Amino acid sequence: MRRYLKKAKPKIVQTSDNEEEKHEENLNVSQSNKNANRRKTKAKEKNSGKFRVKYENEEGDDDGEDSQIPLIPKVKKQSSFHSVDDLISRRMDALSHESGYSNAYVDELKRKSRQTPSEFTKKEEDSSTKESELQTRSSPPLPVNTSLEWNMLNQGIPEEAMIKELKDREGRKRNIAMMTDNYISLETGDQLMLAQNHKEEKLLQTEDEIQDEGYSGFENYVEESEKLQEIYHHSSESLRTRSIQMAVDQKNMEMELDDEDIAEPIQSWEHTQIKKGAFGESPAFTNGLSVKLPNILTMDEQIQRLKEAIASEKLQQEERSQIIKSLMEEELEINEQEEKIKHSFIDLDKTLLNNLTKSKS
């Protein structure tokens, strides 16, 4: 029965004194609200550039500083560009002794990094010097004539990888030689082969460099090209090519002088016209051109030529007969050897059969 019993509420009677108290309470509430608003504005001015997070179960800020919401600082956007040193330091922190990575793996990462700090390079230098000293103490001195291939084989490198590495090295050397010993002119685009440059100066010049340097760069380019042309003109290769060309031209001139039997096309045409009688029978044309008659052999000379031809044919026949005889003799020897081999096989078969019969018996 007690659950259903309700407590009696005191009944408040409205009087003039109660109305005055209520008015005073309303004034106090309005003044407290104004003070709270002032605090909020001051907090906003102080915490400009920061944002506030309001939670779901949050109530009003009537209690002042006790009920203030926590302020979170503004998050800056991280730049996409990181320095190499920072990355290395972070990686080294990750690869500490607690991470469980081996020292070899860490050394590989150090070598592969683009820019290593001075601490790691010094350590590597010290370790390399120690290893070299140990190798010199332990290993015997190598002979002077040991080649690169022999050293690679001693290291345990397979032959295929060794051949590939040597080919790559030759290609790299060829490319470096092409860059150092060639000059490409910008006007014609031709490639000039120069003599060996022991100073290893860069002789290749591009249009971009000239345009960047301006007119002074163009003047330097012209002077440099003239110098290079002089070097090429006086180089051993150019002298060799010129001497070969001069010798070929001289030989051609001598051949033209020696070949008097072969008439030029104009002279042959004139000769045919004179034969036809186009120019008449004037002595100026007939005496000016020397007509060459064919060389006709006499009977004795023809007989001598025939005798020489017959003698040469007889000699050739004798040589052929000797070759045929030698071939026939070789064939006979081969046949005899084949017969001997056949007889030996027959004897072997007989001996094997005899041995088998004896073993069975």
Swiss-Prot record:
Presence of keyword Plastid: no
Compositionally skewed regions (Basic residues) per UniProt: 1-10
A GO cellular component annotation in the UniProt record: nucleus
Biased composition (Basic and acidic residues): 44-57, 120-134
Main subcellular location: cytoplasm
Pfam families in the record: NTR2
Record's compositionally biased regions (Polar residues): 135-147
UniProt entry keywords in alphabetical sequence: Coiled coil, Cytoplasm, Nucleus
Location of the region described as Disordered in the Swiss-Prot/TrEMBL record: 1-82, 94-147
Coiled coil: 295-349
Subcellular location(s) per record: Cytoplasm; Nucleus
TM segment ranges: none
One Gene Ontology term from the biological process aspect of the record: spliceosomal complex disassembly
InterPro entries per the UniProt record, alphabetical: Ntr2
Protein name: Uncharacterized protein C17A2.08c
Species of origin: Schizosaccharomyces pombe (strain 972 / ATCC 24843)
